[in-house]
């Protein structure tokens, strides 16, 4: 039984290139989706962040220029001091949906649209896919 995945990537991202090479090496079918041209929607991000059981911060590209120039860390810190966890997640999802460059990549989604992984750590992808 073969499953196809969607990989949300930036074309120049070296981590995305490593992830795609890993998928190719393991003959795993995928569709490439530009995280810039077709950034994740609020609905998608709400679903994926909930399914992941990860901190919302894991979904941010913390090394990106957009994250740093917009002072997103400070926004998240402020939200976490003043809002409930659910409100923080909702605010963060809204922010992530505004710009694909804010999102950590790659994002790996299964054929049914469910979250599989964020970022590329070979051991995590191996555990999830092989």
What are these regions (language model features)?
Residues 2-26, 30-35:
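Local sequence-structure signature of Cys/Sec-based thiol-disulfide redox active-site neighborhoods
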Residues 37-130:
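Thiol/selenol-based redox catalytic cores and closely related redox-interacting motifs
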Residues 1-3, 103-104:
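Residue-level preference for short coil/turn positions at secondary-structure junctions
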């Amino acid at each position: 039984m073969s499953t196809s995945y969607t990989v949300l990537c930036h074309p120049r991202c070296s981590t995305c290139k490593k992830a795609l090479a890993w998928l190719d090496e393991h003959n795993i079918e995928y569709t490439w989706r530009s995280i810039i041209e077709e950034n994740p929607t609020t609905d998608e991000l709400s679903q994926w962040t909930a399914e992941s059981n990860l901190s919302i911060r894991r979904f941010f590209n913390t090394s990106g220029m957009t994250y740093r120039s917009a002072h997103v860390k400070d926004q998240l810190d402020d939200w976490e001091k003043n809002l409930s966890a659910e409100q923080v997640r909702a605010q963060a999802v809204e922010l992530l949906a505004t710009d694909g460059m804010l999102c950590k990549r790659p994002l790996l989604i299964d054929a049914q649209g469910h979250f599989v992984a964020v970022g590329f750590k070979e051991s995590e992808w191996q555990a999830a896919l092989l």
